[in-house]
Amino acid sequence: MGLLDAGITQHNVLITSVDNVLNWARLSSLWPMGFGLACCAIEMMATNASNYDLERFGIFPRSSPRQSDLMIVAGTVTMKMAERVIRLYEQMPEPRYVLSMGSCSNCGGPYWEHGYHVLKGVDRVIPVDVFVPGCPPRPESLIGGLMKVQELIRMEQIGLSRADALKKLAEKSVDPQFVIERERKAAGA
């Protein structure tokens, strides 16, 4: 539900809740900070290129954690790098979200069994809101994950915890490939 879907009275007065206005503003101007560590970073960069154009979703990448509300961890997180991931996460203002992109950041990837130096998932050091699977995931998958973050923001309420919002999001899950194909068809028509 967008802000314009709310009720409008005869005198052009918008009637909605404060939650809806705040959530609409936050999801319409998502500022991610990419933390590219391996081959997933190449796919993340491709997603920011003109072929996929993330700005049409209101997503504009930032280079500073103090200006970001979303951290995209893309690639292999080693034990030494985990400290820096935590530091950057702590520098982000609230509300902050984390998207884990790729098998390596999700669960250690091909290094999970024999890589003593690899963190077995970035969720062991910072809370992760959305996981994007793949090795490396395609840009379409990352866009689907970003749309999941936007849905999570849309479902947040002042009295609702993030865990409850994540449960509601899981119940309303939609295949991201379907959404991308629908947008491509609409753009071509």
Curated annotation (Swiss-Prot):
Domain of life: Bacteria
Names of the cofactor(s): [4Fe-4S] cluster
Compartment list: Cell inner membrane
GO cellular component, one term: plasma membrane
Co-factor binding comment: Binds 1 [4Fe-4S] cluster.
Catalytic activity line of the entry: a quinone + NADH + 5 H(+)(in) = a quinol + NAD(+) + 4 H(+)(out)
Keyword terms of this UniProt record: 4Fe-4S, Cell inner membrane, Cell membrane, Iron, Iron-sulfur, Membrane, Metal-binding, NAD, Quinone, Translocase, Transport
Pfam families with a match to the protein in the record: Oxidored_q6 (PF01058)
GO molecular function, one term: iron ion binding
InterPro entries on file: NADH_UbQ_OxRdtase-like_20kDa, NADH_UQ_OxRdtase_20Kd_su
GO biological process terms, semicolon-separated: aerobic respiration; electron transport coupled proton transport
Top-level EC class as recorded in UniProt: translocase
Entry membrane topology: Peripheral membrane protein
EC number: 7.1.1.-
Keyword S-adenosyl-L-methionine belongs to the record: no
Chain sites annotated for binding [4Fe-4S] cluster: C39, C40, C104, C135
Subunit structure: NDH-1 is composed of 14 different subunits. Subunits NuoB, C, D, E, F, and G constitute the peripheral sector of the complex.
PANTHER family reported in the protein's UniProt record: NADH DEHYDROGENASE, NADH-QUINONE OXIDOREDUCTASE SUBUNIT B 2
Similarity annotation: Belongs to the complex I 20 kDa subunit family.
Biological function: NDH-1 shuttles electrons from NADH, via FMN and iron-sulfur (Fe-S) centers, to quinones in the respiratory chain. The immediate electron acceptor for the enzyme in this species is believed to be a menaquinone. Couples the redox reaction to proton translocation (for every two electrons transferred, four hydrogen ions are translocated across the cytoplasmic membrane), and thus conserves the redox energy in a proton gradient.
Protein name (database record): NADH-quinone oxidoreductase subunit B
Organism for this UniProt entry: Pelodictyon phaeoclathratiforme (strain DSM 5477 / BU-1)
